[in-house]
């Protein structure tokens, strides 16, 4: 019988290799699932299928996993390397598969009793033939069900390129023996647990059935909240109920997605072509976190940072290829233009107006629609920053969508809701040229199909893209930890805990996004070149600085989620030089090669520097203090950092608390000393003159931030009673003048938002009294600290500009 099965498998191999593509999930199971290939592996499949076996085996061999067709030999005993939980259909089905599997499990458990070093890993594996969830009003089942031979043939032809082999987290038999013993009941329990796992996996791969859009509209329009809003609309505008209902339907039609699985499959092919045209690879990290949440039945809300319009497509593409359901995406109404709007809608986009404050009907409809998505179990994605960052830094969170998410939890949401922060990064952002023009004062160009095509047509060779899933926040757990009484007050429309919770969770999302930063060659090369006054370094200096950056990021990690490049500084530089339209040039003179950043590209490069500025700000501050004092006691350095840190924390969403800050600073000092960038003797730190250039380049990352803080603080010294609005305006004007006089290219240097953030942090740190008047003692102490870290030339320019401004206004 075994020979016939092998012959049959060989017959299947040729057509299947032509029709079915290798699509393993995850892409590298050994690394991502932490598999120990030195211990025996047993693959657990849901049911007997020779077609599935051939596809699954081919993927195993391609991934360097043990061949499932061979047997495990343990202490002279040979046992199968795979088991089936259930019988299959038609040819070669395994009668008594359940009993056979239990027997094999028992034999493996018996071996664990006699060999203490043995740890067999059970890996659930399933082959997913297409992933259409089906429609609510149709009786068909998704194609993950058990298929017969004829159905498999059609599936191979139709879904061949959309067939995935899903490897799940391994179960340690050693752990099972230690925790539960090794009798026969444990073997049966293992089989039951594996069956439940496959059932959950099917749901996590396809998601709930797609809704009948019209039926969904009818249900929503009959909801109490929307009916009340319609009545209020009719009364306030003095129109009939019928007219208000038509307006409500129109709004709902404007908002709602119209997902089509066939459209998703088509765009998947297009996106595969697009990424290959534009990028040399998409690096995905920590997706296992999300798969775990999906298997546990969580309602998942993806909250990525927003760099580019292409973020919408990238995250859905990545999730689809990680075996997860692409989410419903909250997209700006500006993207609802022909023909993109209709296409986006079919891929899961639902549209939101930029502002709907005061529009009670729109607000009620949008809130109920979002709540309905949660209720039906669809994952959702929204951009908490509200719009794309033009500077490369995270923007302050807009809390409207988070507020509606918490309202959904508050109003009888039965499944746990987990927020998944996502870091999205690129070595070249498609719209970066447009951002630079807008920051120079050009009007924002309205989105249209022609603009999209023009951008894509002229770009290629953009390096790599990065998607890193940050630490999830399960809302009920967060609320129970920080607002223990939240359930008791849940009957109130807007309980006391609600607004602080929305603000705190939104802030924590930003912190977790930054904790998941993916550092790339472009970030590091750009940071080094922008740290030089002339935006140029010798090749040797640049490579030395890149090495210093790389060593510190590895030895003093910002967080365990940060992803670092694993190539040499030389390889990083060559990679950046090979990218198109970057503006990094090599020039030669009698002394060697100089790497230079074109002046016109300086503003563009600050975008990539700013992506990872939060990772460098503390080492830059340490370097800046030591450089300006030349020699300083550790205690004094720590004292200066403690004064400045709260403002950096608020502006850049840093995650260190006071105790963690002290540990991080000491580790940075030790690393600088290890690199011989500074001298460290007991409680005394000083510059190492032979490495002072490295220290100067490190310190440059803080200069513009300190200068901005100094501008605002100096204005407050001169005008302690100034209003917040005037303080923001005055700070911005002084910064603009300083940027012109001293050639500062950073686009955020005179951005009103960063001054607003700093002033808000001053208030939070009690630099203003209850009446809003400046607490001069505290401000003067902060001004003194800042003035010691800024050049005399800059200090004089700031003071002179402020005095001139006062003269003009008097």
Swiss-Prot record:
Top enzyme class: transferase
Superkingdom field: Bacteria
Renumbered ranges of motif HXXXXD motif: 306-311
One GO term describing the cellular component: plasma membrane
GO-annotated molecular function: glycerol-3-phosphate O-acyltransferase activity
Keyword set includes Transferase: yes
UniProt pathway: Phospholipid metabolism; CDP-diacylglycerol biosynthesis; CDP-diacylglycerol from sn-glycerol 3-phosphate: step 1/3
UniProt membrane topology term: Peripheral membrane protein
SUPFAM superfamilies: Glycerol-3-phosphate (1)-acyltransferase (SSF69593)
Gene Ontology biological process: CDP-diacylglycerol biosynthetic process; fatty acid metabolic process; phospholipid biosynthetic process
Enzyme Commission number(s) of this protein: 2.3.1.15
Compartments, as annotated in UniProt: Cell inner membrane
Catalytic activity: sn-glycerol 3-phosphate + an acyl-CoA = a 1-acyl-sn-glycero-3-phosphate + CoA
UniProt entry keywords in alphabetical sequence: Acyltransferase, Cell inner membrane, Cell membrane, Lipid biosynthesis, Lipid metabolism, Membrane, Phospholipid biosynthesis, Phospholipid metabolism, Transferase
PANTHER family on file: DIHYDROXYACETONE PHOSPHATE ACYLTRANSFERASE, GLYCEROL-3-PHOSPHATE ACYLTRANSFERASE
Protein family (similarity comment): Belongs to the GPAT/DAPAT family.
Domain notes: The HXXXXD motif is essential for acyltransferase activity and may constitute the binding site for the phosphate moiety of the glycerol-3-phosphate.
The name this protein goes by in its record: Glycerol-3-phosphate acyltransferase
Organism: Haemophilus influenzae (strain ATCC 51907 / DSM 11121 / KW20 / Rd)
